[in-house]
């Protein structure tokens, strides 16, 4: 179900950052596969859009949905109230098409894959709505479902040195990731310094990821800045 899918996404997001939790996740969970079959045959998403290929894209409406269904249990409703929805402009920043472009089914499918790869989005659907007046024009309704992005991390090192971290992969609904880590000794609870990391996954719409981090721990002081782009990104 969609609820189970979001649960797996949330657990995977929390465990993917460190080797041991990541290994445990892979041992204990098998992520459900998105059902792409119809009558026993694989459904090509782009083929469903072929009737609209070449038509002019008109209005693009973004409908953002919370992590859990509004009718969920009490804990899920509380989580929805705590969670800040991804902003409209953040979703639009990741779109590979604009109003006035010709609809390309393959491009829309690739765009859905791109947006699903974001830590803060668990799913996306694109609905094509034929224009009531102009048969050469279609409007798009893009529906996104947020992921739960707040997580706690920890690390145990030699000589009683410990790290505790808190991160949000969608700080204030911006799509940016902020992580704060503090270090202390388990022996006498002496302070060992703080580290802060900030990541922007799509800097100014360029699809480059900007990263900056700094601070100190028991071992050293650091200041890092980086700019990278994944090979498969636009």
Residue ranges and their predicted role:
Residues 1-234:
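Immediate N-terminus of the mature polypeptide
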């Amino acid at each position: 179900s969609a609820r189970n899918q979001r649960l797996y996404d949330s657990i995977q997001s929390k465990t993917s950052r460190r080797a041991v939790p990541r290994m445990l996740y892979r041992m204990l969970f098998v992520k459900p596969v998105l059902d792409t079959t119809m009558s026993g045959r694989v459904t090509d998403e782009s083929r469903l859009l072929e009737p609209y290929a070449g038509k002019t894209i008109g209005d693009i409406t973004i409908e953002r949905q919370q992590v859990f269904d509004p009718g969920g249990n009490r804990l899920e409703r509380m989580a929805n109230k705590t969670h800040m929805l991804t902003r409209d402009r953040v979703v639009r920043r990741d779109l590979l098409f604009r109003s006035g472009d010709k609809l390309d089914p393959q491009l829309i499918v690739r765009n859905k894959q791109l947006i699903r790869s974001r830590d803060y989005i668990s799913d996306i659907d694109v609905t094509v709505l034929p224009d009531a007046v102009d048969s050469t024009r279609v409007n798009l309704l893009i529906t996104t479902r947020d992921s739960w992005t707040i997580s706690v991390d920890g690390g145990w090192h030699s000589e009683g040195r410990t790290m505790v971290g808190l991160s949000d992969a969608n700080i204030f609904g911006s799509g940016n990731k902020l992580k704060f880590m503090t270090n202390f000794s388990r022996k006498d609870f002496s302070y060992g310094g703080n580290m802060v990391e900030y990541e922007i996954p799509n800097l100014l719409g360029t699809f480059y990821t900007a990263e900056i981090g700094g601070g100190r721990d028991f071992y050293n002081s650091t200041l890092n800045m980086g700019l990278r782009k994944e090979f498969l990104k636009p």
